[in-house]
């Protein structure tokens, strides 16, 4: 399985266009050791030619330009992207579908709850239905594994996770199964497994076992502390209120990752306020000392 990190930041990217927090100001001025990052999305493939997008970021045009394998140039209009899987209906994971409209029809895999959001609160399926067949909806049963034509060796097992529907969702404060999923992606040729959960509000015993059984875990790294948005003065909500488990301290994701002995451990969906973006920070050093990597745009993993 080929895994390519198209974007590794949370919504707004890094630096966020209107933010002058220490991280954003520092990366703009070159006064901190940090990489510019686009909004989170990854691509996976079993042959290096045909690719599946996991989430469609608002930055998708630039991401695909930087990702040369996405353009095999076999004909006048071409792309290596054949399918899109949506983990949720968050704007930073779905607005890229609008940019992909020239490639319609496009196969889009998502749960019924995500499809409801994308035909009501943010009706992108409706908007694109006249674009050469539009978005072709394939329903994900959040309790059942599925396969995608052309990717015979890959199996996708959804996992219902605790997080939150987006603010625009008609059921923002009425959670349903399928609002957010994680994915266990198994490559039956190499017998390797990826656990992908860019939006993760809680780690329970089931998720711990799945992570231990995986060869690579790529999980939510939005915030270092639960009150980070408040402490930096950029917001009023905690991480948990937004559906994101913080990294540090008791009950943070790092305390769980440190219990894993086998898999490669990667944090993705990093908010612009998170001190781990500064590679000279104590927080980045702490992750490195615990063999936890911070995803960056262009990062590649082979399983």
Swiss-Prot record:
The record's annotation in InterPro entries points to: Metallo-B-lactamas, PQQ_synth_PqqB, RibonucZ/Hydroxyglut_hydro
Kindly state which keywords UniProt assigns to this record, in alphabetical order.
PQQ biosynthesis, Transport
UniProt xrefs under Pfam families: Lactamase_B_2
Name any Gene Ontology BP term: pyrroloquinoline quinone biosynthetic process
| Pathway named in the protein's UniProt entry | Cofactor biosynthesis; pyrroloquinoline quinone biosynthesis
| Keyword Transport in record | yes
User: Which CDD domains does this entry report, sorted A to Z?
Assistant: PQQB-like_MBL-fold (cd16274)
Q: Does the keyword Transport apply?
A: yes
Q: Name the NCBIfam families on file.
A: PQQ_syn_pqqB
Similarity comment text for this entry = Belongs to the PqqB family.
**What job does this protein perform?**
May be involved in the transport of PQQ or its precursor to the periplasm.
The protein depicted here goes by the name: Coenzyme PQQ synthesis protein B
Please report the organism this UniProt entry assigns to the protein. Answer: Acinetobacter baumannii (strain AYE)
Q: Which gene encodes it?
A: pqqB
């Amino acid at each position: 399985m080929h895994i390519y990190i198209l974007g590794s930041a949370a919504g707004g990217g890094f630096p966020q266009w209107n933010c002058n927090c220490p991280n954003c100001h520092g990366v703009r001025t070159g006064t901190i050791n940090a990489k510019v990052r686009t909004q989170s999305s990854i691509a996976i493939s079993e042959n290096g030619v045909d690719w599946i997008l996991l989430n469609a970021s608002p930055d998708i045009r630039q991401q695909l330009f930087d990702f040369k394998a996405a353009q095999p140039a076999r004909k006048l209009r071409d792309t290596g992207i054949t399918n899109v899987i949506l983990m949720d209906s968050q704007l930073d994971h779905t607005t890229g579908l609008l940019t992909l409209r020239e490639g319609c029809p496009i196969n889009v895999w998502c749960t019924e709850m995500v499809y409801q959001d994308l035909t009501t609160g943010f009706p992108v399926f409706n908007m694109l239905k006249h674009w050469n067949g539009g978005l072709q909806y394939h329903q994900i049963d959040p309790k059942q594994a599925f396969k995608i034509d052309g990717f015979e060796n890959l199996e996708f097992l959804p996992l219902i996770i605790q997080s939150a529907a987006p603010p625009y969702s008609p059921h923002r404060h009425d959670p349903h199964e399928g609002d957010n999923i994680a994915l266990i992606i198994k490559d039956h040729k190499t017998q390797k497994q990826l656990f992908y959960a860019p939006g993760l509000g809680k780690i329970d015993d089931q998720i711990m076992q799945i992570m231990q059984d995986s060869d690579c875990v790529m999980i939510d790294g939005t915030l270092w502390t639960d009150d980070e948005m408040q402490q930096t003065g950029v917001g009023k909500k905690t991480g948990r209120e937004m559906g994101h488990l913080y990294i540090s301290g008791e009950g943070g994701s790092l305390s769980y990752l440190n219990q894993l002995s086998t898999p490669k451990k990667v944090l993705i969906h990093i908010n612009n306020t998170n001190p781990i973006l500064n590679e000279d920070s104590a927080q980045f050093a702490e992750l490195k000392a615990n063999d936890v990597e911070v995803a960056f745009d262009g990062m590649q993993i082979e399983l």
